[in-house]
Amino acid sequence: MSFQDRTAEFQACVTKTRSRLRTTTANQAVGGPDQTKHQKSEFTRIAQKIANQINQTGEKLQKLSQLAKRKTLFDDRPVEIQELTFQIKQSLSSLNSDIASLQQVVKGNRNKPAQMNQHSENVVVSLQNSLANTSMTFKDILEIRTQNMKASQNRTEKFVASSSMNANPLINSGNSISPFADYNDPKPEANEDYLSLNLGDGANTRYEQMALLESQTDTYSQQRMSSIQNIESTITELGGIFSQLAQMVSEQRETVQRIDMHTDDIVSNIGSAQREIVKFYERMSSNRALLFKIFGIVIIFFLLWVLVT
C-alpha cells in the first residue's frame, strides 16, 4: 500500500488562508475608523450648521430689538418688524426640528464608543440650551413690542379725542352765543318757512378734516390690532417650541445625571490618588537612609556593568 505525502499542499493551503484572513482583518481595520470618522464628521457638520443658524438668528434678534424699542410714531417701521418676526419664527421652528433630528441620530448610534456618545449628547444639550435662550429673548422682544404698540395706540386715541373736542363747534363752554349765528344772513319774512342752517365754509372744512382724521385713525388702529394679534399668536407658537424643548431636555436629564455621577467619581478618585502620593512622598522623605542605600546600589551596579563591558 503506497502513501502520498501532501504535507506541502496542506502548508500552502494554511498559508493562503492566513493571508486571506489577514487581508480581511486589515480591510476591516482600515474601513472601521474611516466609517467612524465619516459619521463623526457628518454629526459635526450638522451641529456646526445648527450653531451657525442660531448665531444668525441672534443677529436678527438684535436688529429686531432695536426696532421694537422705538416708541415714537415717526420712527416706527412695522413692515420691517413684521418681516423680521416672520423670519425669526421660521428659523426657530426649523432649528427645533433640526435639533430633534440630531437627537434621533445620537440615539441611533448607541453602539458607538461611550466617550463619543457622551460628547454627542453634550453637544445636543448645548444646542438645546442655546435655542431655548434665543426663543426666550425673542419672546421678551415681542412682549416689549406689544406694550409699546398698545401705549402708542392709547396716545393716538387720546389725541384724536382731544382734537375732536376742540374742533367741535357744539362743544364750546366759553361762549353763550350760538356759533352758528350769522348776522349777515337774511331774516325770515312773515309767514315764511325758514329751515336752512348755515354752518359757514370754516365749519364745513373742520368737519371734513375731523372725518378724515377719524378715518385714518380707525385704519391705523385696525392695523395695530392686527399686528398685536399676530404677535400674540407668535408668542403662542413659541410656547409650543418651549414644550418640545422641555420634552427633549427631560430625555437628556438621565444622561446629564449619569455624567454628573461619573464626574463625582473622577474627582473622588483624583483626590484619593493625590492623598496616596502625598503619603508616599512623606514616607520617602522621612527615610533618607534608604534613599542613600538605593542610590549606592545603583552606582555599584553601574560601575560593575562598565567594568564588565
UniProtKB/Swiss-Prot annotation:
Keywords noted in UniProt: Coiled coil, Golgi apparatus, Membrane, Protein transport, Transmembrane, Transmembrane helix, Transport
Domain of life: Eukaryota
Coiled-coil ranges per UniProt: 37-66
SUPFAM superfamilies registered for this protein in UniProt: t-snare proteins (SSF47661)
UniProt xrefs under SMART domains: t_SNARE
Membrane topology label: Single-pass type IV membrane protein
Listed name of the protein: Integral membrane protein sed5
Gene for this chain: sed5
